[in-house]
Amino acid sequence: MWKKRKEHLIPLEKSKKIIYLEKRGRRQEKKSVGAICFAVLAVLCLLYCLTIALFMGYGTAFFAVWGALAVVCGLVSFVLSRKRLMQKLPRVLKIMVVICFILGLLCFGVVEGLICSRFAATAQPGADYMIVLGAQWKNNGPSYVLKKRLDKALEYLQENPDTYVIVSGGQGSDEPVSEAQGMYEYLSEAGIEEERILLEDKSTSTYENLYNSSSLLDKGKDRVVLVTNNFHVYRGEKLAEKMGYMHIEGLAADSYPAMLPNNMLREFFGIIKDFWIGKL
């Protein structure tokens, strides 16, 4: 190995010893595997961010996080590809960064596993109440994710005629009506009796959905089915349990496959935030 390396070096006599110097331009530093991986991640994150922004409808600006991730991955790739820079960094700092990265990955994996564990949640028949969590209501009707929730709720309500339904959701600045009003009209037009539909039109978050809806039922006695999209069921159930719902079951509706990575990442941060402030 040393003999092969010497072929690329220039001998220089000094103090009766031969010192080998690198020829300029003859050898280039190889990119590390880590640098290549982070560069690929940066490109994928940027492409996904642009795809959501240009071609998909989105209800929040959370997709911009993918752009931020692209920048972070790009910077990490740049640092890893500079061997001299890496050598100058303190060993303790590099060890701490690696440990934090591994712990972060483990935390992310555990939380995402919990989210996935409720992807196929089903509910037993005969519930007293159903709560449908609101989502964006557009000028031409429910958004994709909300329509999936309403259709899943409709299936259950048709099979369980004694179950009442609470449609929960306020009105955003870009919504023509409150989410509750829109859902009320959607379900009534689909054949659900109006007297079975209760409106809660003040909430602006999942926590408020459940808190405000609790005044319309007895959360200590009533059996309640919570309808939301698959990626959202785990957090919804845990928030309800923490709030005192004694008999709560999630009912998972499908979600938009192309938006699933974005929704899963958003749920991760949502769970971490709710856990941090004591709501979970």
Question: Where do the language-model regions lie?
Answer:
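Short, positively charged and aromatic/hydrophobic N-terminal segments
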Residues: 3, 9-10, 14-21
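Membrane-water interface of alpha-helical transmembrane segments
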Residues: 28-39, 60-64, 87-98
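Membrane-embedded alpha-helical segments of integral membrane proteins
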Residues: 33-81
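Structural signature of transmembrane alpha-helix termini at the membrane-water interface
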Residues: 47-54, 75-82, 106-117, 272-279
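Cytosolic-side transmembrane helix boundary signature
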Residues: 68-100
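Hydrophobic membrane-insertion alpha-helices, especially the h-region
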Residues: 96-110
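A structural signal for short, hydrophobic/glycine-enriched beta-strand patches
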Residues: 110-264
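A transmembrane-helix-recognition feature enriched in membrane-embedded lipid enzymes
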Residues: 260-280
